[in-house]
From Swiss-Prot:
Record-listed E.C. numbers: 1.1.1.94
Assigned keywords, A-Z: Cytoplasm, Lipid biosynthesis, Lipid metabolism, NAD, NADP, Nucleotide-binding, Oxidoreductase, Phospholipid biosynthesis, Phospholipid metabolism
Principal place of residence: cytoplasm
Name by which UniProt lists this protein: Glycerol-3-phosphate dehydrogenase [NAD(P)+]
CC per GO annotation: cytosol
Active site: residue positions: K197 (proton acceptor)
One GO BP annotation of this record: glycerophospholipid biosynthetic process
Source organism superkingdom: Bacteria
Catalytic activity, reaction form: sn-glycerol 3-phosphate + NAD(+) = dihydroxyacetone phosphate + NADH + H(+); sn-glycerol 3-phosphate + NADP(+) = dihydroxyacetone phosphate + NADPH + H(+)
Binding site for NADPH: S17, Y18, H38, K112, A145, R261, V285, E287
Family to which this protein belongs: Belongs to the NAD-dependent glycerol-3-phosphate dehydrogenase family.
MF annotations from Gene Ontology: glycerol-3-phosphate dehydrogenase [NAD(P)+] activity; NAD binding
Entry binding sites for sn-glycerol 3-phosphate: K112, G141, T143, K197, D250, S260, R261, N262
Length: 337
């Protein structure tokens, strides 16, 4: 890795659990890292306590991690930006940073989701609002924030429209013995896998909440990857992407481990709780709740059959309960795999 990359700062926008975990990972590798969040009270607490006790307690910030209170200042610190905010506010954040962007800024994001109310990929949102002059990259894969921040082994996929940006981003991560990145050329597939897996994870949680067991959960994972692959093919994604980190890897992790908010949310739905009660119980953003509607809209627009996604949408937005969904899926007409 060259000296320029080794000393290049990075600005992380979003100080929730995942944004903080990524900022810790970069700064632990020695990169000057600037972390900005929208809530000044939360940021003041991070600055004083030098850890994110709200989301990642007892994990101290490395010395290279700097807290930024002002957005303009945060953007001025680095050429490279990493956006890690919930998908339903992603467009708003792009609007906020637009006045402060320089021509040399390069923009990456680790947000997993689709644009609210449209189902558009986040790359489309950026290019509509900012044009196509900035190199872009998306980071996605099977990562829980707590494990990443703790330095446990993690692997992830990175897709970019600029080879140099991808290689330099990869070089940053590969300073660590515990954090590995695989470059992928398929930005559409990497974005899509990270978004739709949250919806499938809700269905897997619902199944477990109803006590259906491991067989049913595995069937949902398998048929879920088929849904994601069909939708991806209609949008021009590479089918192989969905067998990698940002596809099957992230899907299996999110559907099977109780660290997953989407899975826990689904479990509560399966147990008969309302969506609002489940959201309140989890206390953090459940991306799959927002993405179910957007994924359903995107599938309808593309003319792609996605029965699991549709049934989750029906539960969240049309008043169905989990038992109705199970009956609908099991009662579908016979077909080949």
């Amino acid at each position: 890795m060259n000296t320029t990359v080794a000393t290049s700062p990075i600005t992380v926008l979003g100080a929730g659990s995942y944004g903080t975990a990524l900022a810790i990972a970069f700064s632990r590798n020695g990169f000057p890292t600037y972390l900005w969040g929208h809530d000044p009270v939360h940021m003041q607490r991070l600055s004083e306590e030098r850890q994110n006790n709200a989301f990642l307690p007892n994990i101290a910030f490395p010395d290279a991690l700097h807290i930024e209170f002002d957005l303009a200042s945060a953007l001025s610190q680095s050429r490279d930006l990493l956006i890690v905010v919930p998908s339903h506010v992603f467009g708003e954040v792009i609007d906020k940073i637009k006045p402060y962007l320089r021509p040399d800024h390069r923009i990456a994001w680790a947000t997993k989701g689709l644009e609210r109310n449209t189902g558009r990929l986040l790359q489309e949102v950026i290019e509509e609002k900012l044009g196509t002059q900035h190199p872009l990259a998306v980071l996605s894969g099977p990562t829980f924030a707590k494990e990443l921040a703790a330095g446990l082994p993690t692997a992830i996929a990175l897709a970019s429209n600029n080879e140099q940006f991808a290689l330099e981003f990869q070089a940053r991560i590969h300073c660590s013995k515990h954090f590995r990145v695989y470059i992928n050329q398929d930005m559409i597939g990497v974005q899509l896998g990270g978004a739709i897996k949250n919806v499938i994870a809700i269905s897997a949680g619902m199944s477990d909440g109803m006590g259906f067991g491991a067989n049913a959960r595995t069937a949902l994972i398998t048929r879920g990857i088929a849904e994601i692959s069909r939708l991806g093919a209609s949008l021009g994604a590479n089918p192989n992407t969905f067998m990698g980190m940002s596809g099957l890897g992230d899907l299996v992790l999110t559907c099977t481990d109780d660290q997953s908010r989407n899975r826990r949310f689904g479990i509560m739905l399966g147990q008969g709780f309302s969506a609002q009660t489940a959201m309140d119980n989890i206390g953090q953003v459940v991306e799959g709740f927002y993405n179910a509607k957007e994924a359903y809209l995107l599938a309808q627009r593309q003319g792609i059959e996605m029965p699991i996604t549709e049934q989750v949408y029906q539960v969240l937005f049309c008043g169905k309960n989990a038992q109705d969904v199970a009956a609908s899926l099991l009662g579908r007409e016979r077909k080949g795999e």
